[in-house]
């Protein structure tokens, strides 16, 4: 079994990865590589490899952005309507704020986890380290308005609180959902 990347035991200016001293080099990350079903991550990872780059960062799908957020064109973190992939399965209930049905925070989306595992495996084949972001602050109200953890977007009624309180312990049910996701 491969070991995770770690600080080099003899020189903390380097990492140790695959039993070799490693410097992580990147110029970009596609935060939406997994959560955006339209994004071709295989081509992206092959492009990183061919350019001698070996690091990417991607988000879990708990946080996403709307098209045009931060004035970014073709933002991979802003999937098209109905295209967000995240850890939780879609329900049969219409009404997700960016198209499609609401999420069920008690059921996992097997397609999402298959895509995540394939992304990480492909990154490994391409020699790319993945920094996986489980949670991200909701910088603006519209971003919280897109989250599956927002009560408006799930059938469980969980997450009825202001965006600034999402990662506090204020909502025990939401905290339980977050803990379950981390364990998964």
Q: What residue spans do the PLM features occupy?
A:
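Short acidic, Pro/Gly- and aromatic-enriched capping/linker segments at domain boundaries
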Residues: 1-14
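Active-site mouth of glycoside hydrolases
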Residues: 10-12, 18-184
